[in-house]
Amino acid sequence: MNADWLHAIEEKLTRLKDRGSFRQLVPTSEAALPWLTRENCRLLNLASNNYLGIADSKEFIERTEQLASSYAIGSTASRLIIGNHPLYEEAEYELTKWKKTEAALIFGSGYMANVGIISSIVGRGDAVFSDKLNHASIVDGCQLSRADHLRFRHNDMDHLETLLQKSPHKQKLIVVDALFSMDGDHANLHDLVTLKERYGAILMVDEAHSGGVYGATGGGLVEELGLNDRVDIQMGTFSKALGSYGGYVAGAKPFIEYLLNHARSLIFTTALPPYIVASHLAALQIVQEQPWRREKVQVLGERLRNGLEQLGFSLCGSESYIVPVLIGDNHDLLLVSESLQAAGIAAIPVRPPTVPRGEGRIRLTVTASHTEKDIDWAIEQFQRLPLVGRRELTP
């Protein structure tokens, strides 16, 4: 074993600990439920991306098992070899109907989808215009593409237009999260569509955190705003509101065929197991049949936001069921997290580099499995915190 190498790693770990940025895995049970178990403590689960409460639904599990009953556990190969089992075609057909596009393609994960899409459609001599707060998978896709990576200030359409005006690039790709995972606010999709049409760009929207919850059928923010025909690429995941695992992209048929021949993160990996793809089908059915789930999570999200705002907490401009409580300094953040977990809330600290330095936060998420009583109790626990991360309110 190379002792110098290990010593260098240990020094880096020590620096992480000194900054309060060291991370560890913590065994967690019942993570799909409203209350979970972590380090032998029962905690209110405000840390899950299971927004619609589907992952723990008995109906979801039963439908999935029925659809997958005649298949083996493993897919045995990549999709382009023999791993493209019939459930893939069924699920992708349902995706095209749901997203109102010509075609769709399922990837192994949302991360793999973003990396594969972006690195396939742009390259040297092209440019990607990316919101500063886009997910790491988008950033990594931009870097792998070798295109010029031009980041615009968060939701700043004037800055984006300035960059587009100055761009000499032939191929221009604009990519944004529809709902930003660490701030809980929305992209300005109407303005983005206008700019992409004005400057001849391609627009890619990542619906990872909005898919399933927004729109008449849960199709996402693009559907809710009626922009299906004007957004070129709709990407999303099955791992959040849809309660399963995997990523997807929907768009024009030639584009999907192009990805099938160029996206390395699809071509050079084993296909998802049939059971997982069966769960995609089951989730798509439930999302469209049960609108009460998305209605409930929106109402509960508003209830939590209102309660915390009244206590003086900064919520990063959240307008959704993702409710980040801004604390700031890492050490203060860890103290708040420990206090909340001692009170009975799974309050997971989010630190740099996931968020900008000095903007550490407790990222709270609401699901349709929660009750009003759960939310009100959580607000009470925040009220008991010392004045860290919130302003003092005048009477």
Curated annotation (Swiss-Prot):
Keywords: Biotin biosynthesis, Pyridoxal phosphate, Transferase
Catalytic activity: 6-carboxyhexanoyl-[ACP] + L-alanine + H(+) = (8S)-8-amino-7-oxononanoate + holo-[ACP] + CO2
Gene this chain is encoded by: bioF
Residue list for modification N6-(pyridoxal phosphate)lysine: 240
Pfam family, one: Aminotran_1_2
InterPro entries the record matches: Aminotrans_II_pyridoxalP_BS, Aminotransferase_I/II_large, AON_synthase_class-II, AONS_Archaea/Proteobacteria, PyrdxlP-dep_Trfase, PyrdxlP-dep_Trfase_major, PyrdxlP-dep_Trfase_small
Pathway the protein takes part in: Cofactor biosynthesis; biotin biosynthesis
UniProt: pyridoxal 5'-phosphate binding residues: 110-111, 181, 206-209, 237-240
Binding site for substrate: 23, 135, 354
Cofactor(s) it depends on: pyridoxal 5'-phosphate
EC number per UniProt: 2.3.1.47
Cross-referenced PANTHER family: 8-AMINO-7-OXONONANOATE SYNTHASE (PTHR13693:SF100), CLASS II AMINOTRANSFERASE/8-AMINO-7-OXONONANOATE SYNTHASE (PTHR13693)
Record carries keyword Transferase: yes
Family, per entry: Belongs to the class-II pyridoxal-phosphate-dependent aminotransferase family. BioF subfamily.
Annotated source species: Halalkalibacterium halodurans (strain ATCC BAA-125 / DSM 18197 / FERM 7344 / JCM 9153 / C-125)
Known partners and oligomeric status: Homodimer.
Highest taxon above the source species: Bacteria
Recorded GO MF terms: 8-amino-7-oxononanoate synthase activity; pyridoxal phosphate binding
Enzyme class: transferase
Task performed by this protein: Catalyzes the decarboxylative condensation of pimeloyl-[acyl-carrier protein] and L-alanine to produce 8-amino-7-oxononanoate (AON), [acyl-carrier protein], and carbon dioxide.
Name of the featured protein: Putative 8-amino-7-oxononanoate synthase
GO terms under biological process: biotin biosynthetic process
